[in-house]
């Protein structure tokens, strides 16, 4: 399968650039002379990808910024639709950014171009009617999580679970001692990692709550130490200011090193998000907390169809780790949940073992598996 062919790819986020670059590498196993074009990030460009626009032009967040940028985003999508219609690729792959890529996939599929979407939107959780448009728009959905694939199968959408790239990247066993040495933490004793979020608004809402929780934990066990990894330099400065109210307290603030901080800890207190998957893959017992604006929470409570918010619980389909949201997220309740792991080591070990089983399920060499599925779609007979 060394024939020359053209593969179109559009990614809208930095995480998509990582996936796209790994996918390009694996697709070249099947198609060594393939050409790739569309919109990609720096990692993809290093591999010879031709990007018609800078990838960061699609990187919009929230509700307001996409509206402000809507005319530009529509112009970019129109160009891509017309370009790929005039120069049909053997397959078009949209990675993440579903509000931008799925309508483009639908328009190209109408022209007879095979389409793939890599990384499912959270259609299983909210706005489930999107499945109708997704079914019309894609020839194949590639999911990172097994329960997502089951959802698409139930709705008759061609799908393949390929595994999660983080499960491939994070080792089965992490060295707690080495992580503690790297961060200058005590080699012995109990350590709790506090991860209040990566965005300014999250840190503003969650940091003080997490630090007050640490105070309650210290009252129960004065030997505890805490480590707080800041997502970047801006969050480091923000957290440093928040810590001014907690002087003479055993909290170690570090810039970056979030995985090292989690690896060094015995228990984690985390804001809900992707970090819960990283914590799972590091086999760390965790307590999940989150707060948002009351109106936003009421709207999401009405829209979201799942009983859980954290990936460990979604994967387990049960309350495997504590989730404390909104008014339930108090320092008293969070500290009780954290200390419960220390007071019940058998429970901690059981959670860690379940996480190890989940890691094995998610570790599938995702990029290779995705490339194999795409190759079968392009050339069913030759790729089988």
Swiss-Prot record:
InterPro entries named in the record: Glyco_trans_19
MF terms (GO), sorted A to Z: lipid-A-disaccharide synthase activity; phospholipid binding
Residue pairs linked by disulfide bridges in the UniProt entry: none
EC number(s) recorded for this UniProt protein: 2.4.1.182
GO cellular component: membrane
Biological process per Gene Ontology, one example term: lipid A biosynthetic process
Keywords: Glycosyltransferase, Lipid A biosynthesis, Lipid biosynthesis, Lipid metabolism, Transferase
Gene3D superfamilies noted in UniProt: Glycogen Phosphorylase B (3.40.50.2000)
Pathway: Bacterial outer membrane biogenesis; LPS lipid A biosynthesis
SUPFAM superfamilies on file: UDP-Glycosyltransferase/glycogen phosphorylase (SSF53756)
Reaction equation(s) it catalyzes: a lipid X + a UDP-2-N,3-O-bis[(3R)-3-hydroxyacyl]-alpha-D-glucosamine = a lipid A disaccharide + UDP + H(+)
Enzyme class label: transferase
PANTHER family documented for this protein: LIPID-A-DISACCHARIDE SYNTHASE (PTHR30372), LIPID-A-DISACCHARIDE SYNTHASE, MITOCHONDRIAL-RELATED (PTHR30372:SF4)
The protein's role, per its UniProt record: Condensation of UDP-2,3-diacylglucosamine and 2,3-diacylglucosamine-1-phosphate to form lipid A disaccharide, a precursor of lipid A, a phosphorylated glycolipid that anchors the lipopolysaccharide to the outer membrane of the cell.
Matches recorded under NCBIfam families: lpxB
Family according to the record: Belongs to the LpxB family.
Record-given protein name: Lipid-A-disaccharide synthase
Organism per entry: Cellvibrio japonicus (strain Ueda107)
Lineage: Bacteria, Pseudomonadati, Pseudomonadota, Gammaproteobacteria, Cellvibrionales
């Amino acid at each position: 399968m060394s024939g020359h062919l053209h593969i179109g790819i559009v990614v809208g986020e930095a995480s998509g650039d990582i996936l796209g670059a790994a996918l390009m590498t694996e697709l070249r196993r099947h198609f060594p002379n393939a050409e790739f074009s569309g919109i990609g990030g720096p990692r993809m460009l290093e591999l010879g990808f031709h990007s018609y626009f800078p990838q960061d032009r699609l990187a919009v967040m929230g509700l307001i910024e996409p509206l402000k940028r809507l005319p530009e985003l529509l112009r970019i999508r129109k160009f891509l639709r017309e370009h790929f219609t005039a120069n049909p690729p053997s397959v078009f792959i949209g990675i993440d950014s579903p509000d931008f890529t799925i309508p483009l996939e639908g328009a190209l599929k109408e022209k007879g171009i095979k389409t793939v979407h890599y990384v499912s939107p959270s259609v299983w959780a909210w706005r489930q009617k999107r499945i109708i448009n997704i079914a019309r728009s894609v020839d194949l959905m590639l999911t990172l999580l097994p329960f997502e694939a089951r959802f698409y199968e139930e709705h008759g959408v061609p799908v393949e679970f390929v595994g999660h790239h983080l499960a491939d990247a994070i080792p089965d066993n992490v060295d707690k001692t080495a992580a503690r040495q790297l961060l200058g933490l005590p080699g012995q004793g109990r350590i709790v990692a506090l991860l209040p979020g990566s965005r300014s608004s999250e840190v503003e809402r969650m940091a003080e709550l997490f630090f007050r929780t640490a105070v309650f934990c210290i009252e129960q066990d004065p030997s505890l130490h805490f480590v707080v990894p800041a997502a970047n330099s801006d969050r480091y400065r923000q957290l440093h200011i928040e810590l001014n109210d907690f002087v003479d307290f055993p909290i170690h603030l570090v810039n970056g090193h979030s995985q090292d901080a989690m690896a060094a800890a015995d228990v984690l207190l985390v804001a809900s998000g992707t970090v819960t998957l990283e914590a799972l893959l590091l086999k760390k017992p965790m307590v999940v907390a989150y707060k948002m604006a009351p109106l936003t929470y009421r709207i999401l409570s009405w829209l979201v169809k799942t009983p859980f918010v954290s990936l460990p619980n979604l994967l387990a389909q049960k309350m495997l780790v504590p989730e404390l949201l909104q008014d339930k997220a108090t320092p008293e309740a969070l500290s009780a949940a954290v200390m419960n792991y220390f007071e019940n080591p058998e429970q901690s070990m059981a959670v860690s073992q379940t996480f190890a089983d989940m890691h094995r399920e998610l570790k599938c060499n995702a990029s290779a598996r995705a490339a194999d599925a795409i190759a079968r779609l392009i050339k069913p007979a030759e790729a089988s």
